[in-house]
Amino acid sequence: MSELRTLPVLPLRDIVVFPHMVVPLFVGRDKSVRALEEVMRGDKQILLVTQKNSADDDPAPGDIFEVGVLATVLQLLKLPDGTVKVLVEGKARAAVVSFTDQESYYEAQIGEVSEDDGAGPEAEALSRAVVEQFENYVKLNKKVPPEALASIPQIAEPGKLADSIAAHLSVKIGDKQNLLEIFDVVKRLEKVFALMEGEISVLQVEKKIRSRVKRQMEKTQREYYLNEQMKAIQRELGDPDDARDELIDLEKRIKKTKLSKEARTKAESELKKLRNMSPMSAESTVVRNYLDWLLSIPWGKAKTKKIDLVESEGILDADHYGLEKVKERILEYLAVQARTNSLKGPILCLVGPPGVGKTSLGKSIAKATGREFVRMSLGGVRDEAEIRGHRRTYIGSMPGKVVQSMKKAKTTNAFVLLDEIDKMGSDYRGDPASALLEVLDPSQNSTFGDHYLEVDYDLSQVMFVTTANSLNMPQPLLDRMEIIRIPGYTEDEKLEIAKRHILPKLAKDHGLKPAEFIVPDKAIRDLIRYYTREAGVRSLERELGALARKTVRDLAREKVASITIDDERLAKYAGVKKYRYGETDEVDQVGIVTGLAWTEFGGDILTIEAVKMPGKGRMQITGNLKDVMKESIAAANSYVRSRALQFGIKPPVFEKTDVHIHVPDGATPKDGPSAGIAMALAMVSVLTGIPIRKDIAMTGEITLRGRVTAIGGLKEKLLAALRSGVKTVLIPQENEKDLADVPQTVKDGLEIIPVSTVDEVLKHALTGPLTPVEWNEAEEPITTSAKKDDGDSDAMLTH
């Protein structure tokens, strides 16, 4: 290596420059332009180094290869768009010793790499072989200019020969960089020879593929010509027997099927078109598939069964325990249909957490009405064509899910359950929710248009029922449906469901007789309390399924006649308890409140923690809280400060104290205003030092005047409180009327206290009374450096 020198660096993307190469480059990055400007002020020497990742716009020294080329700038031209066109000539290999950041560009300390002259018989033999191989390569690769064949053989120096050929190879940047980093001339020639051999093999395969494709195209054109001749002959001689039989069969089906006038005209037109086509043509297959779909869906085929309300009620009661109000509304719906013999009523939408029986309720309604049940899953549907079908111009086109469901039902008055309607999405392919508007509108669905069928189809006799976990769907879609909420089950209801439905099903699935698998009520209750925490019964079914599997195993292992799941076996089979039930903190604590939340999966408890520390009056909020909950905290903060003296808090405390409010389970986003009174209680507790009762939970929105306003999801929240072992729940006075919808077992298990003001909340929740204080501003002034609670970003830090 020669003596070290320092040069500006020009990082290259997607190109490796070799010595003796003259290359035009377009430079647009600021650092690269400034490096060139610096070079032009000096001796026009620059280091060209390839960067490792071509997508990197600002490569660091570690992102650049350590071997490059010392080059001379021959010409530089600034273009109108701010970029620079530069002509460079590679001089010699250079190894980078270190990089220096000059802010506007990088400099590198380099040393030129000395190479041997490559003299010797081995180098001479390799040079001849490489030149011969290069001639073969140029014949196959049309991208190499023909003049290269004239210039390359004239190069006498083996090293220069290897570099010149490497510059013309269509190989990966990494392979070219490897060649640049090979300083031994003989090894470099060997590497170039190996790379050319690999490229020649690939080019030969490409040539074979091109020849094969060309022959295939000629064959296709020949087949087309022969098919046209065959069609002419067929017109003279008549159709073959098979094709004629198929056409006769299609004609009979068209006459037999009760098509609409529009559909019959379309079918006859397509059949006429099919008669004039070759049976072997691709277009005839498309037409045959279309006619098959058109004639396979039901036209005027209806199953009739009079709705018997007593029988329907018996089916609903047999299939589902509890859900009395839901079943009552469904029976009302069926009664109106039975009386009017019409389906012009609202579309029912069953909304509730997972595992509460929405889909099975749909099956029961279908059984009660005597209709064919078809489930149409909409979860993950993002393409409008999945609802309306694809147009026939596309390869592999077919009707949408609605028409496919009708074909499966084989009757025009089927029962179609649109499952998970809230899980649809939309993207550049359209909005499937908008396509459903026509399906679910009784005044429009008699002329439903599927893109594939291209004729109107009558859906007015179909009974549509939808299911969803939440109401997170477009408003026009919601307007077409009547929402029936299915809340979570109480503990007693889960117990009965397990005994009546889950255990018999599991025993049958696992080959167990009732006498072999005995699960007492206590074991089921323990599973509900300590191993599941859900609104539905899916987790309970999984836990009972685990007990059944272990029972089957132990019946074979222990050679006993039956197994009873007592406390010992439950602990052995189910493992460690996953949840606490009926256990509260041992002591009342300052700043820790139990709130109640509603999610699309049911109710849940929401622990809120608050601490104070010396500071400058800042409020810090953590726990993945969204905007509405942050505003609720701000309102609670303002209310507490406005009533500070009545609560026993002197105003200077606010300027000297930082308060941190945290809602655990930070991975789960949280939003909504119903934790307002819990936030206010936490602030008062932490600022006064008075503990909060450990066995109390609450829900309610707060106003700036301290009034407690109504919230939603009361039943789900009370169920969550009961599941969690809370004894007392504070609810807004305005929600007292909603207690009529809450099961009596829940009301019996909780002490429910309606409140209308924050003062009442503090009275019930704090363990001690609040002592008002007096404050003389002259004696204890508020300093001007205190942070004002004006709602700006300085008053509240959120993370």
UniProtKB/Swiss-Prot annotation:
Q: What induces it?
A: Constitutively expressed at a constant level throughout the cell cycle (at protein level). By heat shock.
Q: Where in the cell is it found?
A: Cytoplasm
Q: What processes in GO biological process is this protein linked to?
A: cellular response to heat; protein quality control for misfolded or incompletely synthesized proteins
Tell me where it mainly resides.
Answer: cytoplasm
Q: Lon N-terminal domain location, by residue?
A: 7-200
- Catalytic reaction(s) noted: Hydrolysis of proteins in presence of ATP
Supply the SUPFAM superfamilies for this chain: P-loop containing nucleoside triphosphate hydrolases (SSF52540), PUA domain-like (SSF88697), Ribosomal protein S5 domain 2-like (SSF54211)
The enzyme's first-digit EC class, named in words, is hydrolase
Database matches in Pfam families: AAA (PF00004), Lon_C (PF05362), Lon_lid (PF22667), LON_substr_bdg (PF02190)
Which terms in the GO cellular component ontology are assigned? cytoplasm
The record places domain Lon proteolytic at 587-768
Keyword Isomerase appears in the UniProt entry: no
Binding, ATP: 352-359
Q: Which cysteines are joined by disulfide bonds?
A: none
Q: Which PROSITE patterns match?
A: LON_N (PS51787), LON_PROTEOLYTIC (PS51786), LON_SER (PS01046)
Where are the active-site residues found?
674, 717
Q: Which family does it belong to?
A: Belongs to the peptidase S16 family.
Q: Which HAMAP family match?
A: lon_bact (MF_01973)
What is the role of this chain?
A: ATP-dependent serine protease that mediates the selective degradation of mutant and abnormal proteins as well as certain short-lived regulatory proteins. Required for cellular homeostasis and for survival from DNA damage and developmental changes induced by stress. Degrades polypeptides processively to yield small peptide fragments that are 5 to 10 amino acids long. Binds to DNA in a double-stranded, site-specific manner. CcrM is an important target of the Lon protease pathway in C.crescentus.
Name it. Lon protease
**Organism in which the protein naturally occurs:** Caulobacter vibrioides (strain NA1000 / CB15N) (Caulobacter crescentus)
Gene name per UniProt: lon
